[in-house]
Curated annotation (Swiss-Prot):
Belongs to the Maf family. YhdE subfamily. Keywords: Cytoplasm, Hydrolase, Nucleotide metabolism. The record marks 11, 69, 151 as: Important for substrate specificity. One of its GO terms (biological process) is nucleotide metabolic process. It is found in: Cytoplasm. InterPro entries: ITPase-like_fam (IPR029001), Maf-like (IPR003697). Its main location: cytoplasm. It comes from Thermotoga maritima (strain ATCC 43589 / DSM 3109 / JCM 10099 / NBRC 100826 / MSB8). The lineage of its organism: Bacteria, Thermotogati, Thermotogota, Thermotogae, Thermotogales. Its EC number is 3.6.1.9. PANTHER family: BIFUNCTIONAL DTTP/UTP PYROPHOSPHATASE/METHYLTRANSFERASE PROTEIN-RELATED, BIFUNCTIONAL DTTP_UTP PYROPHOSPHATASE_METHYLTRANSFERASE PROTEIN-RELATED. This is dTTP/UTP pyrophosphatase. Pfam families: Maf (PF02545). GO terms for molecular function: dTTP diphosphatase activity; nucleoside triphosphate diphosphatase activity; UTP diphosphatase activity.
Length: 204
């Protein structure tokens, strides 16, 4: 069985690489929309992404992983900004406040259709308008829910965090690994006598 990451996000690809398993990447063609709740939104969109790729390759023996992230501020869902001005507006709203980041991860194969959802609370410092302008103009966060990436300069915006850091990045790595491990899909491969490279990881 091969594993495919249904994503266009370079951050999710980088995090998947930390698992030490071989995988492919394919961008799903799924229109993003907000549903009644943030949990339902990330659950449904991550599943749609994984199913889109799975159906395209349904003749193959694969496991597809899809993921989606939203930011919630005062009960309102913030997705990806459509313009730099909208990005600045989002960051002004987040300044000095708590918000919640929700990330869903879906796993789809011929025998599996599971979704996990993780949430993390984040509090931003008070952000001067000049800093917001600098960040948006330099980093152009149009591909990020809430208009920021906690793994880049926006890390300095964070005053407090309660929960999983990688949920905010957009891919709760520990939960993904635990799921794969418990399913028997992530395992340490048997070391061959002629293998001088140390322990190896196998998938499937």
């Amino acid at each position: 069985m091969r594993i495919i990451l249904a994503s266009s996000s370079p951050r999710r690809r980088q995090l998947m690489e930390l698992l030490g398993i071989e995988f492919e990447v394919e961008k799903p063609d799924v229109e993003e929309e907000f549903l009644e709740s943030p949990e339902e939104t990330v659950r449904e969109l991550s599943l749609r992404k994984a199913e889109w790729v799975f159906k395209k390759r349904k003749e193959e023996e694969i496991l597809v992983i899809g993921s989606d992230t939203v930011v919630v501020l005062d009960g309102n869902i913030l997705g990806k900004p459509e313009s730099l001005e909208e990005a600045k507006g989002m960051l002004k709203k987040l300044s000095g406040k708590w918000h919640v980041v929700y990330t869903g991860v879906a796993f789809v194969s011929s025998e599996t259709k599971d979704v996990i959802v993780s949430s993390t609370k984040v509090r931003f410092r008070e952000l001067p308008e000049s800093v917001i302008d600098y960040y948006v103009e330099k980093y152009r966060p149009l591909d990020k829910a809430g208009a920021y990436g906690i793994q880049d300069f926006a890390a300095v915006f964070v005053e407090k965090i309660e929960g999983d850091f990688f949920t905010v990045v957009g891919f709760p790595l520990g939960m993904v690994w635990q799921y794969l491990y418990e399913k028997g899909w992530w395992k340490v491969a048997s070391k061959r006598e002629d293998d001088k490279g140390g322990a190896r990881v196998a998938f499937g």
